[in-house]
Amino acid sequence: MAFAQSVYNQSSVLKINVMVVDDNRVFLDIWSRMLEKSKYREITVIAVDYPKKALSTLKNQRDNIDLIITDYYMPGMNGLQLKKQITQEFGNLSVLVMSSDPNKEEESLSCGAMGFIPKPIAPTDLPKIYQFALTYKRNGKSTLSTEQNQKDANVSVPQQIMLVPEQAYVLKTKKKNCSSKSDTRTVNSTNVSHVSTNGSRKNRKRKPKGGPSDDGESLSQPPKKKKIWWTNPLQDLFLQAIQHIGYDKVVPKKILAIMNVPYLTRENVASHLQKYRLFVKRVVHQGRFSMLSDRGKDSMFRQTHIKEPYVNYYTPSTSWYETSLNNRSFYSESVHGHSRLLSEAREPVRYNQMSYNYMNRNISFENQPSQNEETRTVFEPPVMANKISQTSQVLGFGQLGPSAISGHNFNTNMMSSYGSLTPNQPGTSHFSYGMQSVLNNENATYNPQPPANATTQPNLDELPQLENLNLYNDLGNTSELPYNISNFQSDDNKKQGEEDGDWTFVNINQDQSNGESSNTIATPETNTPNFNINPNQNQGQAVPEFTDWSFLDQQELVDDDFMNSLFNNDMN
């Protein structure tokens, strides 16, 4: 008898009574047949086509109904209003809302519905509905007591039941109230294998702080400490205290005593002191790193070279350009007492006497006189010429070779030379004799005193001549010369000139009958209207400079490409 009673109780538990409310009779019939003819034979469907009829049915069969499924759109009363009315009259019953509008899902769940079923219903939804209803029946349709509801009256998040993960799209929970009168409830699941609640371990309601816990123990927490804002006046007091005590001897207790601020505690000062020490350590580290990095920098970056530029007072000797052809490195002198080694060894030459900025490579040459005129051997004009040439330093040019004479560098009463051709420099010939007097006094009449061994022509007696300038004798028996000079004939009373390209060869012969050698001088032809070497003209004008070619290498004199490139650079 007892065994039969237990079997009956077990079978009664597996039987589920579901009430379906829908105003569409066709859908209601299909829905009822699907539930009844499913493999779950224990489901009994109560079909109702009107909301008010559903309320009357609940009055008669309240204890026999385990689950209510209602449509959202119905005449006279929608599904949410029906759910609210059922809650007011019959307590908390499980209600599922179904609708073809997916936008009603959130509203339904927020108003207390246990789940939402989209229309049309698929056959896969049937087992989920059965499991949902079975869970409620096994729990004995348990709801929270009145006391529990009163305690949770201020809780806005209802605890709702969710099915297994595959049923997540059917039943969802939202944390929102439908109205101020909606009841809240919590249903605890005992079948963990099938049902999980939103009030799981993560979302279980926390009891107020200081209230009784589940084991009866009260956990009292200390109040939170008040946060201290270190304002500027408070920070000034803190720094003054550190300065008074000393950074090495400072401790929080002494700082607190000196500051004498009532609301400060020792912990506040200790925390702030620790942060301050970390800040000081970081500043010191950055300072050391910057000092090590600046040690390798050039000293010119630490000087005021932009506002007060450096000036070179050295005598210009090779070129007025800032670099020579071979990029030889020179050092300039600072007028502010700084080191001369302001530039690196690879820095190009800045060898002029005008003020310039080290950071600006495009310097402009101003019209300035030399600062050390007493040491010059070549006249420097007070006004620069319009065109500046650069003397080559290849094979001694510029030091001992010919000066690059531009056609626009000669004025009426002065001549500009770019070669430092003094007798003190080593070389095969010194032809600055007779030039010093006219260069030092440009307005004086040029009357040179040639040396005893210099050979002159009677018609060119006022021109400075060079000694031992026989180019043919210096080259020996070389068969190839850069220019043919065999056609020049000696003449005692006049000079012969043959123009070959841009160069004029002048043959000066004094007396070949006496066995003396003739001198052949090659000079660049200048087309300036202000330059004239006619001896009959006024000798107060500037006289061109004659250069010596005898010291050059024979192979390079034979090379036409070398000579043409050299002449073109000098003439340009």
UniProtKB/Swiss-Prot annotation:
Main location: nucleus
Portion annotated as DNA-binding: 227-277
InterPro entries linked: ARR-like, CheY-like_superfamily, Homeodomain-like_sf, Myb_dom_plants, Response_reg_B-typ_pln, Sig_transdc_resp-reg_receiver
4-aspartylphosphate modified-residue sites: 71
Positions with biased composition (Polar residues): 179-197, 509-522
Motif window: Nuclear localization signal: 224-227
PROSITE patterns (UniProt xref): RESPONSE_REGULATORY
Subcellular location: Nucleus
SUPFAM superfamilies xref list: CheY-like, Homeodomain-like
UniProtKB keywords: Activator, Cytokinin signaling pathway, DNA-binding, Nucleus, Phosphoprotein, Transcription, Transcription regulation, Two-component regulatory system
Domain of life: Eukaryota
GO molecular function: DNA binding; DNA-binding transcription factor activity
GO cellular component, one term: nucleus
Post-translational modification: Two-component system major event consists of a His-to-Asp phosphorelay between a sensor histidine kinase (HK) and a response regulator (RR). In plants, the His-to-Asp phosphorelay involves an additional intermediate named Histidine-containing phosphotransfer protein (HPt). This multistep phosphorelay consists of a His-Asp-His-Asp sequential transfer of a phosphate group between first a His and an Asp of the HK protein, followed by the transfer to a conserved His of the HPt protein and finally the transfer to an Asp in the receiver domain of the RR protein.
Reported function: Putative transcriptional activator that binds specifically to the DNA sequence 5'-[AG]GATT-3'. Functions as a response regulator involved in His-to-Asp phosphorelay signal transduction system. Phosphorylation of the Asp residue in the receiver domain activates the ability of the protein to promote the transcription of target genes. Could directly activate some type-A response regulators in response to cytokinins.
Stated name of the protein: Putative two-component response regulator ARR13
Organism for this UniProt entry: Arabidopsis thaliana (Mouse-ear cress)
